[in-house]
């Protein structure tokens, strides 16, 4: 298992989590292909984290799955916008930390035995 962490992304964590949920559990190659065509800003950052995690482990993208994709809230940048009559309102610019873990795609023993039993039933 290998991981990659990208910190202080200028993107709201709630928006990034929508994309992170989509790719969790997918094959890394399939996840990168689907992220490439997503119009969201966070898709580029999550794709970067996935490819970095794959490279950190020394794997190929087609032999690993995205086992975990977590988005945490980072520091919030606070800015002020001038308003009427000398007042000001606060602008919050949230940041995110993206953690991606990839692991080898292994077929479990249960799945193979179920597949064998199903093929035996079809033959008889």
Curated annotation (Swiss-Prot):
GO terms for cellular component: cytosolic large ribosomal subunit. Keywords: Ribonucleoprotein, Ribosomal protein, RNA-binding, rRNA-binding. Transmembrane segments: none annotated. InterPro entries: Ribosomal_uL22, Ribosomal_uL22_bac/chlpt-type, Ribosomal_uL22_bac/org-type, Ribosomal_uL22_CS, Ribosomal_uL22_sf. GO terms for biological process: translation. PROSITE patterns: RIBOSOMAL_L22. GO terms for molecular function: rRNA binding; structural constituent of ribosome. Part of the 50S ribosomal subunit. PANTHER family: CHLOROPLAST 50S RIBOSOMAL PROTEIN L22-RELATED, LARGE RIBOSOMAL SUBUNIT PROTEIN UL22M. Belongs to the universal ribosomal protein uL22 family. NCBIfam families: rplV_bact. This protein binds specifically to 23S rRNA; its binding is stimulated by other ribosomal proteins, e.g. L4, L17, and L20. It is important during the early stages of 50S assembly. It makes multiple contacts with different domains of the 23S rRNA in the assembled 50S subunit and ribosome. This is Large ribosomal subunit protein uL22. It comes from Campylobacter lari (strain RM2100 / D67 / ATCC BAA-1060). The gene is rplV.
């Amino acid at each position: 298992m290998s991981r990659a962490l990208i910190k202080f992304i200028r993107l709201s964590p709630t928006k990034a989590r929508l994309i992170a949920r989509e790719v969790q559990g997918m094959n890394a190659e399939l996840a990168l292909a689907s992220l490439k065509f997503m119009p969201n800003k966070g898709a580029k950052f999550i794709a970067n984290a996935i490819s970095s995690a794959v490279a950190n482990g020394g794997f190929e993208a087609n032999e690993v799955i995205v086992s975990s994709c977590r988005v945490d809230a980072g520091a919030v940048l606070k800015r002020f916008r001038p308003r009427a009559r000398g007042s000001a309102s606060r602008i919050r610019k949230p940041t995110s930390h993206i953690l991606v873990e990839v692991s080898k795609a292994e077929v479990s023993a249960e799945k193979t035995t179920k597949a064998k039993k199903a093929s035996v039933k079809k033959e008889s």
